[in-house]
Amino acid sequence: MRPRFRLALAVALLLPHTPLSAAPAATPRTSSGELQGARWRLDVPTGWNGELVMLAHGYEPVGVPQPSPMPANDSTAGLLAAGYAVAQSAYASQGWAVADAINDMERLRTHAQSELKDVHRTWILGFSMGGAVAIATLERLPQHYNGGVSLCGANLPGEQLANDLLTTLVAFDYFFPEAEGLPRQGLVSADAAALSQMALYQGIAAALQSRPAVAAQLATRLQVSAEALPGTISLHAMILHELATRAGGMPVGNLRTVYRGFGDDKAFNAGVQRHAPVALAQRYVRGKLALTGAVKRPLVIQFNNNDPSIVPRMQAVYPQLAERAGATSLLRVLPAVGEGHCGFVDSQVVEALKAAAAPL
């Protein structure tokens, strides 16, 4: 797995920063610092080609330790070897931090360009959740970029993503009610949100093992393998609960949703738990996490084969949005490569970036 699967609106406040090391001339020049609570680093190769890559990392669960100074993303070395300068932010918050990340990356872009002085072209490259950051940036701040790349990206509007996560949780609760080790109120409940990720995963995995035929049916509907299903469900629960905390309540509901593809759909729709959205939270995902498809700079999208996190139904969303927005001329979807979530090697990352610069 290549990058981390983890994935402030005022004037930039730049804290003093120091070089990480007095490097020999043959090694990249590295500096680091903090901008309004977001740690950052900037790496510049000795043979810099004059181009800057703003690298947006993926989802990082709340509470994961953050080393200081900020370590480089796994793909940094390959980009530096290809001649690009790489700027990356740790973001001011953890979790589904798309809204924070857009602002953190913009502050860092301003600083990086002022430090580098002579930047010929600027790109934004995002992995996983960072893919949504990259695309939202190209939609909202196109004047600062020549184009961008979303790799293994969660390229969905926030409301659509949250609805997808909710579907996963209520489907599990329907097929596995009162599972041992899990709250009787279900995976959407506050009690489920209070569980540790390990306890949540273990309870889900045990329930799925108790009814393998039903688990296989659910895996097919959710477009993941049976082996990946426990991790996918627990991940969806973690992200939805964190998003609800960030947004001020459950951001989506299913009071009128008609579900399909769960076997006896009539029984499923009659028996599935129903939830109402919180208006404030709904406004948050519709505003802060919106994606419209109206990309205004060249955008390259690429996924991996058999990705249990960004499954085919999710992969199709942004191209459809771009088509409705009349922006398909700026969008290039490359064939899937690698396996799993964010299974890219350095050369594939560089080639995707070069594709963004190629004539459409």
Protein language model regions, located:
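Conserved alpha/beta-hydrolase "acid-adjacent" motif
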Residues: 309-314
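Histidine-bearing beta->alpha loop at or near hydrolase active sites
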Residues: 331-344
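Short beta-strand element of the alpha/beta-hydrolase
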Residues: 50-59
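N-terminal cap/lid segment of alpha/beta-hydrolase-fold proteins
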Residues: 23-48
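Accessory cap/linker subdomain of secreted extracellular hydrolases
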Residues: 154-290
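Gly/Ser-rich "nucleophile elbow"/oxyanion-hole loop immediately N-terminal to the catalytic nucleophile
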Residues: 47-48, 108-128, 144
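Primarily recognizes the serine-hydrolase "nucleophile elbow" in alpha/beta-hydrolase
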Residues: 121-176
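Short beta-strand/loop motif that positions the catalytic acidic residue
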Residues: 301-303
